[in-house]
Swiss-Prot record:
The keyword Protein biosynthesis applies. GO terms for cellular component: eukaryotic 43S preinitiation complex; eukaryotic 48S preinitiation complex; eukaryotic translation initiation factor 3 complex. The lineage of its organism: Eukaryota, Fungi, Dikarya, Ascomycota, Pezizomycotina. PANTHER family: EUKARYOTIC TRANSLATION INITIATION FACTOR 3 -RELATED. It comes from Botryotinia fuckeliana (strain B05.10) (Noble rot fungus). It comes from the Eukaryota. It is found in: Cytoplasm. Keywords: Cytoplasm, Initiation factor, Protein biosynthesis. Component of the eukaryotic translation initiation factor 3 (eIF-3) complex, which is involved in protein synthesis of a specialized repertoire of mRNAs and, together with other initiation factors, stimulates binding of mRNA and methionyl-tRNAi to the 40S ribosome. The eIF-3 complex specifically targets and initiates translation of a subset of mRNAs involved in cell proliferation. This is Eukaryotic translation initiation factor 3 subunit H. GO terms for molecular function: metallopeptidase activity; translation initiation factor activity. Pfam families: eIF3h_C, JAB.
Length: 367
């Protein structure tokens, strides 16, 4: 009864132990820029998915001598597909059995993967998460750790699940315009992001608070009176200085803009392919319509001659209508464009004001 009640409560957050975060960061950084994947274990508690341990999947070594330039991409593709490979499924089961023997949470609650520059929304992510989420214990998540973003000083760890609408569409494998319009499925409905809470045990928290802090070796020069404090008033945040006008563009921002342009080009390529399909379909439908009109006229003539009418469904054998290409790739690319746009918007927030200030100083004054 408790399990049934817990499944009725939807997942609303993910709680990750700090040790698990360190394991994921270390595993992803060790294989960078090759994709790293692994399994996470834990338990579900009243809608909060508690992740208590993790372990990486075995990696595929690529020869460094006489290697092809595409070997790196091949290794990344193999690593990205690792969570659903048969060998790693067996490896995961054996690891969970060993964890159970040492009284560690042995419930698989998903998997993790590394990302570079926010580029993680692809078919591998969808297939891996669908592989985990379609199982009887579907309360699983995908943790995405952006190594390059974390190198800038802020941890980038996000949790995603496939939305129920997308799960139903992916099971049918029919991503046509008609089906997407019926289900009202858009690129925004592919993934559902859950908030992450980094958790420490009470024992570890107490230990951190009890750690001694090194005392300063030099005496601090405190002001002797309020008069000294007033004479040395620190500058306000808006105090004029040259550093605040620095327009240095983050290399991460430049690379993100380049990848955004590549994704936009891919979007136009997908759009041109779909428009080509529509033109082909229109031409074939025009031929079918003309053939039907001709056959109807022939049957009318044969009816006046008291002859048997000719079949009107022969067009299915004579003409072959083109098959509509899957719109899944276009949806994933649109979702990736949105991801890049959010990253660019976050980076340019602090630069836009400076650029407008420089522009106003460069333009001639208007009387």
């Amino acid at each position: 009864m408790a399990d049934i009640a817990s499944k009725e409560v939807p997942l609303h957050s993910v709680q990750v132990e700090a040790l698990v975060v360190m394991k994921i960061v270390k595993a992803c950084a060790a294989t960078y820029p090759t994709t790293a994947t692994g399994s996470i274990v834990g338990m579900d508690s009243n809608g909060t998915l508690q992740i208590t341990n993790s372990f990486p999947f075995p990696t595929t070594d690529v020869a460094t001598s006489d290697s092809h330039p595409n070997d790196h991409m091949a290794a990344s593709n193999i690593a990205a597909a690792a969570p659903r490979s048969k060998a790693n499924v067996i490896y995961q089961s054996e690891m969970i059995k060993m964890l159970k023997e040492v009284n560690v949470d042995a419930n698989n609650v998903g998997w993790y993967t590394s990302a570079n520059m926010g580029n993680f929304i692809n078919t591998s992510l969808i297939e891996n998460q669908f592989f985990y989420q379609k199982e009887p214990n579907e309360r699983t998540v995908a943790l995405v750790h952006d190594v390059s973003r974390s190198a800038q000083g802020a941890l980038s760890l996000r949790a995603f699940r496939l939305s129920p609408t997308f799960m139903a569409a992916y099971k049918e494998s029919k991503f046509t315009t008609e089906n997407m319009q019926k289900s009202k499925l858009t690129y925004k409905d592919i993934l559902v992001e859950l908030p992450i809470i980094v958790h420490n045990s009470h024992l570890l928290t107490s230990f951190l608070h009890q750690m001694p802090v090194e005392l300063p070796k030099k005496d601090l020069d405190f002001p002797a009176s309020f008069a000294d404090l007033n004479r040395n008033t620190p500058p306000t945040p808006l105090y004029p200085n040259m550093e605040s006008l620095d327009l240095s563009i983050d290399p991460y921002l430049e690379r993100t803009c380049d990848m955004l342009l590549d994704s936009i080009e891919t979007h136009y390529t997908e759009l041109n392919n779909f428009q080509y399909f529509q033109r082909q379909l229109t031409r074939e439908q025009a031929k079918v319509t003309a053939w039907k009109a001709k056959r109807t006229a022939e049957n009318a003539t044969r009816a006046t001659q008291k002859l048997a009418p000719l079949p009107e469904d022969e067009w299915e054998r004579l003409f072959k209508l083109p098959t509509e290409p899957s719109r899944l790739e276009g949806m994933l690319n649109a979702r990736q464009v949105e991801q890049y746009s959010r990253q660019v918007d976050g980076f340019t927030a602090s630069i836009t004001g400076k650029m407008f200030a420089v522009k106003s100083n460069l333009l001639p004054e208007q009387n």
